[in-house]
Amino acid sequence: MDLALFFRNEVKPALGCTEPGAVAYAASIAARHCPGEPLSVALSLSLSMFKNGRDVGIPGTGGLRGNRLAAVLGVLAGDADKGLMALEHIDMAVVERAQTLLDAGMVTEEVVDGVPGVYAAVTLRCAGHEVTVTVAGRHDRVASIVVDGEVVGGEGMERAPEADGTLHGGASCEPSASFTEPPLPAYLEELRECDFAQLWDMAAGIDATLEQELLRGAAMNMAVARMGLESGWGLGVGHTLAAHAEAADLHARIRFMAGAAADVRMAGAPQPVMSSAGSGNHGITATVPVAVAAEGLGVSPRVQAEALALSHLVTGYLKAHTGRLTPICGCSVAAGAGAAAGIVKVLGGNAVQAERAVASLMASLMGMLCDGAKGSCGLKVATAAGEAYAAALLGMDDRGVQRPEGVVNPDIATTARALARLSREGFAAADAVMVELLGGGKH
């Protein structure tokens, strides 16, 4: 597998929550193709995009939230060249104008079925023109750009088969058209076929350039964690836990540092984090526990980098099975599993112990639901970080899950398949119910 390609695409900076970031990105592209004053913006979102963007803070807005705000900001001042960081340079004057347009009812939002988990279609109308930009499959993957009914750009999406079995390819200007998930990139298909020993060996084989990039990403997320400790952002999970913990307690420090970083991100601080598998909170969970353990135990930068690589690879492996956005909390289950494996590497363990740690983490947290991105994600991230360390300790002592326990198996491939089926089939109804509870009708 091309490791450089994996890390370039799966581990990169993101500003704010990636779901409203994707909406803002699509809106900023639409604005490029729609001259004049905006008249209306209509959002058509997947269940997951709706719930993950509904209550999360937008960076640079003073704590304002939501996909609709992200869309208007993207139209008014988004920089499409910056991708998921399209709102990096907005100011309060733009925010005030955006709020005025929202209050005037300029933006509508609806949840649509039959689309990939990552799906946002932004339709912008201005004088005499209508533009629809669709992001699908990945948060930064522009599937189609449709201007006045004509497809002018985008990678295209695979249409679901018609009743007669025929399949039609290409982009559509219909936001609610039925689409299947796009195929995984080749490097993720390769990753899915690996066993745990191969993941372990790949992490050990990173080159000097990747080593430095991984350490840079961890430093970025640790800086965000320290912000959360100092100021008590959001729910103040990390800040509060730190105030009641012994400084020398590594388990507690792993927990409150990860929670603090998520506090900052969910509150909408204008501070980028290094993401993993398309999610900033996945990136926090995958990196901060490993970095805190490495710092506390005084291991070399090389060991820390290999541990970070393993964490991202395990996270990516599990997400390649489940999909980008799921009813199960991927920050806890997938990235938590990655962190557990990475901490075993920091502790001087081996591949067998790390795989057992992954199984123990998943046995603990597999049922945790994702009810959207919001301040309380800090609680889930803190829990996952603490459980990752506990699972790593069990692995190091050759304890924890060593035979099938319920749906969890010590073999990562078997458990990944079970997790994928539970997420896509078992919890699908739960996702729909959650969106109803969150008010996911058109408004």
Curated annotation (Swiss-Prot):
InterPro entries: Ser_deHydtase-like_asu, UPF0597. The lineage of its organism: Bacteria, Pseudomonadati, Thermodesulfobacteriota, Desulfovibrionia, Desulfovibrionales. Residues 156-178 are annotated as: Disordered. It comes from the Bacteria. Belongs to the UPF0597 family. It comes from Nitratidesulfovibrio vulgaris (strain DP4). One of its GO terms (biological process) is L-cysteine catabolic process to pyruvate. GO terms for molecular function: L-cysteine desulfhydrase activity. Pfam families: SDH_alpha. This is UPF0597 protein Dvul_2496.
